């Protein structure tokens, strides 16, 4: 029997993708815990999410951090110092680079991580990894964390209102996962079953995107929140991340 040990981390512990998803924060955290939250966000991201933010964002004691840097060691150290002591949860609001930084900060502080994606350009909200950069903004490597993200809160209307170029980027990135997986695992029958499940998921997601993208893009142009649009967004964020989670190094390159 061939031995190809892999680690499977399928996805976050909780994933909510529907209007009003932010309300689920209170299903898992008390007001006292949320008053000790660290919210980290980008300038455009927090503006995009502003009308959807839950009351927990304004609780006394909450730490708000506007971040403009990279997921670098120096930036994460600075954020950890700025966060202070006795924090309960890290909540990241933004795109892939911001969420990678917030994920790294949460692990540095030993806290659960909640992702609030404001664009659908990558599966960063789903995946338990961060891409690290140096201070000049050059990518160095990625780190897979020992635990899954605790929660993803996806508010579809925020994604609907984002520039369409981000959705197009996510569609292209996610379509590529099927083709990359075929190259990385040319003999899937010799690999663990979960790798094959990941490849099957990549194919299913590819089909969703090929069938629904045209309608989803038109719906976004018309500012209509439809099933086709939500399917494409979930295919990018949840589906794309799940492919890497199931197949590890055999499907991870696109995650």
Task: Walk through the language-model features, giving the residues of each.
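ATP/NTP phosphate-donor binding region
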Residues: 1-88
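Fold-independent oxyanion-binding glycine-rich loops
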Residues: 19, 42-43, 93-95, 116-119, ...
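Short glycine/serine/threonine-rich phosphate/pyrophosphate-binding segments
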Residues: 22, 46-49, 97-104, 123-126, ...
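Structural motif
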Residues: 37-38, 88-91, 112-114, 150-152, ...
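Short, glycine/charged-enriched secondary-structure capping and boundary segments
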Residues: 52-56, 79, 105-108, 128-131
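A short, small-residue-rich loop immediately preceding and capping a beta-strand
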Residues: 83-105, 109-118
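A glycine/threonine-rich phosphate-anchoring loop and its flanking beta-alpha core
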Residues: 108-201
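Active-site segments that bind and position negatively charged phosphate/pyrophosphate groups
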Residues: 191-255
């Amino acid at each position: 029997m061939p031995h190809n040990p892999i680690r499977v981390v399928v996805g976050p512990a909780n994933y909510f993708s529907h209007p009003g998803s932010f309300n689920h924060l209170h299903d898992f955290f008390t007001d006292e815990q949320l008053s000790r939250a660290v919210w980290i966000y980008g300038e455009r991201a927090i503006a995009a999410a502003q009308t959807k933010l839950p009351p927990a964002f304004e609780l006394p004691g909450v730490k708000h951090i506007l971040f403009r840097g990279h997921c670098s060691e120096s930036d994460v150290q600075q954020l950890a110092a700025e966060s202070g002591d006795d924090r309960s949860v890290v909540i990241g609001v933004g795109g892939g680079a911001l969420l990678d930084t917030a994920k790294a900060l949460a692990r540095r502080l030993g806290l659960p991580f909640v992702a609030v994606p404001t664009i659908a350009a990558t599966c960063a909200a789903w995946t338990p990894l961060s891409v690290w950069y140096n201070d000049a903004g050059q990518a160095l490597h990625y780190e897979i964390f020992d635990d899954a993200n605790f929660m993803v809160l996806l508010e579809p209307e925020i994604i609907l209102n984002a520039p369409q170029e981000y959705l197009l980027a996510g569609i292209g990135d996610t379509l590529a996962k099927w083709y990359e997986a075929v190259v990385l695992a040319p003999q899937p029958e010799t690999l663990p079953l979960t790798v094959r499940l990941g490849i099957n998921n990549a194919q299913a997601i590819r089909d969703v995107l090929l069938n629904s993208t045209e309608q989803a893009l038109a719906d976004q142009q018309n500012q209509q929140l439809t099933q086709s649009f939500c399917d494409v967004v979930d295919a990018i964020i949840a589906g794309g991340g799940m492919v890497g989670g199931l197949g590890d190094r055999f499907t991870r390159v696109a995650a």
